[in-house]
Structures are given as C-alpha cells and as structure tokens.
C-alpha cells in the first residue's frame, strides 16, 4: 500500500488539537505550536500572502468591546471623574 488514498483510511491519530488562543483545531500536539495563530508566540501569526485570512482575523471582525467606544471618548477629550460645575 502506498501513501495515497487507500492509506488515509488507516490514519486515526490526531496531530492537532484545540488551541487555547484561537479555538481552532490547529495546535500541533508534538510541536506545541498552533498552525493558525502561532500560539504560544507573543505575536499572532499573520502573513501578507494570506490576504483573505488577514481579513477574517483583523481588528473589527469581533466584538471590539473596548475599541468601539474610543472614538466617542476621543471626541469628548477623554473626560474623567464627575461632571464639572456649571459656571454662572
């Protein structure tokens, strides 16, 4: 039996498992590194030749819990504390 189609039926071991950072089944068990996000590297794996992949994972594709409020706060000068007294 060669390494082609018939041999694929005999494969039953998992080389990849779930990644703690991106959640995909791309974490290589023996290498201990994720083929999708590059975990445990500090920086997320990203390449210019994968333009569509960049588009899927870039800022703005998620909830942006913090970032979506920044522009409004910037417009008001990042106000902090209590309301100022009205001058009469």
Curated annotation (Swiss-Prot):
Cellular compartment(s): Cytoplasm
Record-stated family: Belongs to the eukaryotic ribosomal protein eL37 family.
Species for this entry: Saccharomyces cerevisiae (strain ATCC 204508 / S288c) (Baker's yeast)
Gene Ontology cellular component list: cytosol; cytosolic large ribosomal subunit; preribosome, large subunit precursor
CC cofactor note: Binds 1 zinc ion per subunit.
Cited HAMAP family: Ribosomal_eL37
Subunit structure, interactors included: Component of the large ribosomal subunit (LSU). Mature yeast ribosomes consist of a small (40S) and a large (60S) subunit. The 40S small subunit contains 1 molecule of ribosomal RNA (18S rRNA) and 33 different proteins (encoded by 57 genes). The large 60S subunit contains 3 rRNA molecules (25S, 5.8S and 5S rRNA) and 46 different proteins (encoded by 81 genes).
Keyword rRNA-binding recorded: yes
GO biological process: cleavage in ITS2 between 5.8S rRNA and LSU-rRNA of tricistronic rRNA transcript (SSU-rRNA, 5.8S rRNA, LSU-rRNA); cytoplasmic translation
UniProt GO molecular function: RNA binding; rRNA binding; structural constituent of ribosome; zinc ion binding
Function in brief: Component of the ribosome, a large ribonucleoprotein complex responsible for the synthesis of proteins in the cell. The small ribosomal subunit (SSU) binds messenger RNAs (mRNAs) and translates the encoded message by selecting cognate aminoacyl-transfer RNA (tRNA) molecules. The large subunit (LSU) contains the ribosomal catalytic site termed the peptidyl transferase center (PTC), which catalyzes the formation of peptide bonds, thereby polymerizing the amino acids delivered by tRNAs into a polypeptide chain.
Signal peptide: none
Classification via PANTHER family: 60S RIBOSOMAL PROTEIN L37 (PTHR10768), RIBOSOMAL PROTEIN L37 (PTHR10768:SF0)
Cofactor(s) demanded: Zn(2+)
Keyword annotations: Cytoplasm, Metal-binding, Ribonucleoprotein, Ribosomal protein, RNA-binding, rRNA-binding, Zinc, Zinc-finger
Binding site for Zn(2+): 19, 22, 34, 37
InterPro entries per the UniProt record, alphabetical: Ribosomal_eL37 (IPR001569), Ribosomal_eL37/eL43 (IPR011331), Ribosomal_eL37_CS (IPR018267), Ribosomal_zn-bd (IPR011332)
Keyword Metal-binding assigned: yes
PROSITE patterns recorded: RIBOSOMAL_L37E
Protein name stated in the entry: Large ribosomal subunit protein eL37A
Zn-finger region bounds: C4-type: 19-37
Additional facts recorded: Present with 21800 molecules/cell in log phase SD medium. There are 2 genes for eL37 in yeast.
